[in-house]
From Swiss-Prot:
Note: Negative results: is not active on all neuronal nAChR tested (alpha-2-beta-4/CHRNA2-CHRNB4, alpha-4-beta-2/CHRNA4-CHRNB2, alpha-4-beta-4/CHRNA4-CHRNB4, alpha-7/CHRNA7, and alpha-9-alpha-10/CHRNA9-CHRNA10) (IC(50)>10 uM).
Organism whose genome encodes this protein: Conus milneedwardsi (Glory of India cone snail)
Keyword presence, Disulfide bond: yes
Tissue and organ distribution: Expressed by the venom duct.
Compartment(s) where it occurs, according to its Swiss-Prot or TrEMBL record: Secreted
The name this protein goes by in its record: Alpha-conotoxin MilIA
Taxonomy of the source species: Eukaryota, Metazoa, Spiralia, Lophotrochozoa, Mollusca
Length: 14
């Protein structure tokens, strides 16, 4: 699942 908001931004999402 993609998570592209600051609460869960990581090196593998955005």
């Amino acid at each position: 699942d993609m998570c592209c908001h600051p609460a869960c931004m990581n090196h593998f999402n955005c």
